[in-house]
Amino acid sequence: MRDNLRQYRAIRDALTHGYPGEPTGRLAQHLATLAAFISGIVASKSTQLPKVASHVPGGTKPESRVKRLARWVDNDPITAAVSFCPSAQVLLAPLALQTLVLVLDGSVVGRGGVALMIHVVYKGRALPLAWLVRQGKKGHVPEALHIAVIEQVQRQIPAGAQVVLLGDGEFDGTTLQQTIQDYHWSYVVRTGSHITVRWDGETFRCETVASCITPGTLVELTDVRVTQEAYGPVMLLCCWAKG
């Protein structure tokens, strides 16, 4: 438990740096619980409350610690803006000295839910920066929510930082691409083979390019317009990896 206490204090002190002054009162209590939560998750390698609580330092009974964590999770005033964003900004400040690589991803959570998340890549790990959760299936999240979660992260990015956003095929909406362009970010997203492509005076489907390549081939088309709206110009890459 001594190691858990040392870890908890280190996490609490690091979280405190995200605030302009020393947190007091209710905010300090919430921050202490957040630090305990993070410390317990790291030590237990689990997000189940009983396992997390068993690694939270303190003289209270495990049942009391579980209730404390559960109350914190269910507390409506505990929002990402209050408890998470300050820490994310502290994390991003040193990382932004180099190009920030962000990953946009959708994951199934709970029963019938989907979480839309943006992570920053750091030493081979994806660290979450922002998320939205809704009922639905993966791949069926409206583009407006893609943009909403992008906007959450954009407010945390240090001014002047170079950003590259990576996304799967569900994130190729042209309104989302324009939003990313407006932020002066670079981006790479997959797209479907059915997408309409306009290049060099010709109009064809993306799968036409794919049918012309062989294993180990990379085709690069520049000054491309995509979809019926002719969004662009963008670069289109079509690759058939070996193996």
Segment roles from a protein language model:
Residues 1, 52, 103-105:
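N-terminal low-hydrophobic presequence detector
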Residues 1-46, 84-85, 95-100, 111-113, ...:
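Single, function-defining residue in the core of a domain
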Residues 119:
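Nucleic-acid-interacting cores, centered on viral/eukaryotic replication and modification enzymes
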